[in-house]
Amino acid sequence: MANPIYILAHANAEYLPLESGNSILLPKAYDIVWSLIPFLIILFVFWKFVLPKFQEVLTEREDRIKGGIQRAEAAQAEAKAALEKYNAQLAEARTEAAEIREQARERGKQIEVEMKAKAEEESNRIIEAGTKQLMAQREQVVNELRREMGQNSINLAEHLLGDQLSDDVKRSGTIDRFLADLDTVAPNGK
């Protein structure tokens, strides 16, 4: 097999890359031009199509992030406002509950006073009715006792005198005198 380097070295010497002033680091002008044209085409396509899409995606992401932050801030502000509203309603409800408790306490005291007054009034009425009933019963008992005592005194007088007191006038006069004597003996007997 033939060595390619040997063939290149013995062939036409003016076309060898390392001879006749060709440099690896500095290519020929036609190589630079033909390399620069595709580079510029790729750069133009990149600049015209890829970079705007990339910018659009970046802008969209940035807007989404900013929007997310703004929504989060808005949600946080809304939550804070809702919390303040809730705390205000809670404080108002506590105040209202305290007022209701105080009104109930006052109403309870008022009802207690009214019930005591009604009970006292009812008690006084019952006592008065009882007193009247006792007085009526006392009068009835006193009248019955007077009748019985009058009858007993007549019977006793008839028995002692041995005379019958059949005359109604005599009998009522005797009874009246006896009861009058009895009333003078016990004037405070009521």
From Swiss-Prot:
Major location (coarse): membrane
One Gene Ontology cellular component: proton-transporting ATP synthase complex
The keyword NADP is annotated on this UniProt entry: no
Keywords: ATP synthesis, Cell membrane, CF(0), Hydrogen ion transport, Ion transport, Membrane, Transmembrane, Transmembrane helix, Transport
Entry's localization field: Cell membrane
Complexes and interactors: F-type ATPases have 2 components, F(1) - the catalytic core - and F(0) - the membrane proton channel. F(1) has five subunits: alpha(3), beta(3), gamma(1), delta(1), epsilon(1). F(0) has three main subunits: a(1), b(2) and c(10-14). The alpha and beta chains form an alternating ring which encloses part of the gamma chain. F(1) is attached to F(0) by a central stalk formed by the gamma and epsilon chains, while a peripheral stalk is formed by the delta and b chains.
Task performed by this protein: F(1)F(0) ATP synthase produces ATP from ADP in the presence of a proton or sodium gradient. F-type ATPases consist of two structural domains, F(1) containing the extramembraneous catalytic core and F(0) containing the membrane proton channel, linked together by a central stalk and a peripheral stalk. During catalysis, ATP synthesis in the catalytic domain of F(1) is coupled via a rotary mechanism of the central stalk subunits to proton translocation. Component of the F(0) channel, it forms part of the peripheral stalk, linking F(1) to F(0).
Protein name, UniProt field: ATP synthase subunit b
Species lineage: Bacteria, Bacillati, Actinomycetota, Actinomycetes, Mycobacteriales
